[in-house]
Structure formats: structure tokens, C-alpha cells
Amino acid sequence: MESLASLYKNHIATLQERTRDALARFKLDALLIHSGELFNVFLDDHPYPFKVNPQFKAWVPVTQVPNCWLLVDGVNKPKLWFYLPVDYWHNVEPLPTSFWTEDVEVIALPKADGIGSLLPAARGNIGYIGPVPERALQLGIEASNINPKGVIDYLHYYRSFKTEYELACMREAQKMAVNGHRAAEEAFRSGMSEFDINIAYLTATGHRDTDVPYSNIVALNEHAAVLHYTKLDHQAPEEMRSFLLDAGAEYNGYAADLTRTWSAKSDNDYAQLVKDVNDEQLALIATMKAGVSYVDYHIQFHQRIAKLLRKHQIITDMSEEAMVENDLTGPFMPHGIGHPLGLQVHDVAGFMQDDSGTHLAAPAKYPYLRCTRILQPGMVLTIEPGIYFIESLLAPWREGQFSKHFNWQKIEALKPFGGIRIEDNVVIHENNVENMTRDLKLA
């Protein structure tokens, strides 16, 4: 395998080319990309955890340092002003020397407000990309060039197509997340609480709660029916029935996003349903290829959900086609089949149809689908089907013409298990689909 340094060199060349094209299209001279700043909690002197500007970490794997600036023009070597204060109160990251620093000019910035004297004097034609518009105005950036929509749309669109460097980083993030999932399953099997399972996960991945790309979903029993459950009970339930873990990791700013569901017992209806959802998820991935709309795969999985609802006698006396047509599958899988993945967990440009930002919304029937793109080589997406037993979604179906088709007794028996979700991260290639998650033997 090529070294990360050589992959990064090619990555920078790709970003430079995209930058040249964007600057030419929008008649700008350069982009000033801001890592961000610390923001204090209201009426307090403690800051919120720092989260870096994604457009900044696209260029350099600097994810923990505020007050950094990157100047890029697509021609000259990118110039990074790295915040390096004299500070005995806080940890100060040293000036980086790593695989990537040969391809970027790195300059120490001792004072956060010192960037103004270091930038080119003529700034009227420089675009600012970052979270603090008032800072850009103070630096003399034209208001119309602060987070210009056309430039950002252009860059976002092409972020969908991962470079080999980005894919290498994402495979490393997968390894970390897989280690965490294995540790979490072991903790579940030993009877730990959600809180302690989360600690086991973080320890295995080498992350803190503020390092993971999203808040871990560690859901025992009926908590698995809450799609984004993040409470973390300190006490283990008296009876362990099920465990849904949706948790990721980050490497050089790139995310993994995995979900697994386990049954405490291997010989009940729920355990068989978990196995069947897993099998159908793999079967769907086996059909995926470039040139097909992501929406089609979402719709296809509703047909697979119908098959499982019929097999497990959760819905009875109705064809699978009628279940999908009348949206009886909807309350059981209320979210989309997945989303783009990359520098952000819900990565950008899921609805963009071209580099001008043309938006194609999700179908009205499936409003929570996060991607309507035609799959193309270089895209990375999650595939995360599920079946859940959520009373607020099932309640409207307890009345009306279709109520008789719901096996309410079976549904009540499954509700204490919460739900099921199985999520892998896949890469679209020209002639195949790479399943980064299963390649690491995560069952």
C-alpha cells in the first residue's frame, strides 16, 4: 500500500485543482479557511468543546486547534498559520511535523489576533470560509465573499468523491470503531450498564466523548426504539434482552459510523429477526453499483422489510407489494437507508445533483432520506436498515382499515426489545462495492 505521505500529496493536488476551478468560476483570488474559535458557555468562562471547520480539516489533519488559518489559491503551496501561543494555563499543541507537512507551508501564529498583519494586504478578492463572519469583516474581507454559497456548494459537491488518502483514513477509522464494537458487545454480555458499556467502547477506540464523530448511541432493551438515544443509564436493567450500539470513530478528521444489534438470547423470535435484518442488509449491498440512484436502494429495502414483516407474522394477510404501497413498512423503518459519510458523519451534498448545487429533495413518502444522488465511484455511504417497535409511530395504525393486518400481540411481545439496526460503511468503485466494515470481519 502507498504511504500516507504519498497519498496525501495526491490528495492536496486534487484539492488544489478543485480550488483553481472554484476560484476561476467565482472570480476570486484565494480562499482563507478558518479552523474556528472557542466559544464560551453563556455567562461562563468555560468553552464548549472545539469542533473544527470541516472545510479546514479537508486540507490538513488538524482537528483540535482553534485560531488556525489556511490560505489556498490552487497554485502556490497551501499556507497554514498554526496557532502556537505562549500559554501556561492550557495545553499547547506543538508545531506539526508529520507526513503532511512537506506539502503545506506551516507558520507559527503566536497570537490569535495576529493574523491580520500576516495576510496579503489586498483582500477584497479573497473568500472566507469559516464559522466567525465578524472575524472576516475585521480582516477586511468583503461581506459578499464571506462563506460564498457558490464556492461552498462547488467544494461540497466534489467532497462526495473521496481521494485515496481520504479512503485510507476512513479505513483506519473503521478499524478503531470495530475494536470499540467488539469491546462493547463483550461489556453487554457481561451485564454492564449503558454508561459502563460506553466507557468500554471509548477505551477500546482511544477516544474521549468529545472525540467521537457523534454522540454514541448505547441502547439496551426498549431504549433501542429511540433512534438517537444518548442518555446512558448508570444502572443495568434487571433483564438484558437486547443491545443496539450506533457508534463511530475518527481518524485524521474522517469518520466511521457503524451500528450493530445483539440479542441476549440466541433462541427467540427477536434473535431471528436480528439475523434476518442482517442478511437482508448484506443482500442489498450485494446489488449496489455505480450509476443507480441511492433512492432506489431505499425503496428496495422497504420491499425487504415487507418480506420480513410477513415472514415473522408481524403483518398478516397482506401482500408485500401492498404493504409498501400503503406504507405499512413506514412505522417499522422511519429513517432513510443511510447517508453520505466522510469529514462529517452526515456528509455534505447528499441532495446535490451537480456542482452548482442543484437540489433534489427526498421523495415525499420518505422525507428523512438523506441522499438522492446517483451513485458514482469514490462515494462513501452508510447502509443502515432497521426495524423498530415505536409506539408513537404504531399508534395511528391501531385504528382504521389496516389495523387488522397488524399482529398486535406479536408487536407487544417485541416492543421490550426496542428495535434493530445494522449499519455498514461502503465505498462505491467502478466495478464493485467495497464494504469497509465487513472487510474487518465485524459480524
Swiss-Prot record:
A molecular function (GO) term: metallodipeptidase activity
One Gene Ontology CC term in the entry: cytosol
Residue spans crossing the bilayer: none
Enzyme Commission code(s) on record: 3.4.13.9
Cofactor binding note: Binds 2 manganese ions per subunit.
Binding site for Mn(2+) 2: D246, D257, E423
Alphabetical UniProt keywords: Dipeptidase, Hydrolase, Manganese, Metal-binding, Metalloprotease, Protease
CDD domains, alphabetized: Prolidase (cd01087)
Name of the top EC class for this enzyme: hydrolase
Chain positions recorded as Mn(2+) 1 binding sites: D257, H339, E384, E423
Requisite cofactors: Mn(2+)
Biotechnology: Can be utilized for the kinetic resolution of racemic phosphate esters.
Any single biological process term in GO: proteolysis
Reactions this protein catalyses: Xaa-L-Pro dipeptide + H2O = an L-alpha-amino acid + L-proline
A Pfam family reported for this protein in Swiss-Prot or TrEMBL: PepQ_N
Coiled-coil features, chain-numbered ranges: none
Family of this protein: Belongs to the peptidase M24B family. Bacterial-type prolidase subfamily.
HAMAP family in the cross-refs: X_Pro_dipeptid (MF_01279)
Note in the entry: Has a stereoselective preference for isomers with R-configuration at the phosphorous center of organophosphonate diesters and with S-configuration in organophosphate triesters.
NCBIfam families: PRK13607.1 (NF010133)
Function: Splits dipeptides with a prolyl residue in the C-terminal position and a polar or nonpolar amino acid at the N-terminal position. With much lower efficiency, also catalyzes the stereoselective hydrolysis of a wide variety of organophosphate triesters and organophosphonate diesters. Is able to hydrolyze the organophosphorus insecticide paraoxon and the p-nitrophenyl analogs of the nerve agents GB (sarin), GD (soman), GF, Vx and rVX.
Name used for this protein in its record: Xaa-Pro dipeptidase
Source species: Escherichia coli (strain K12)
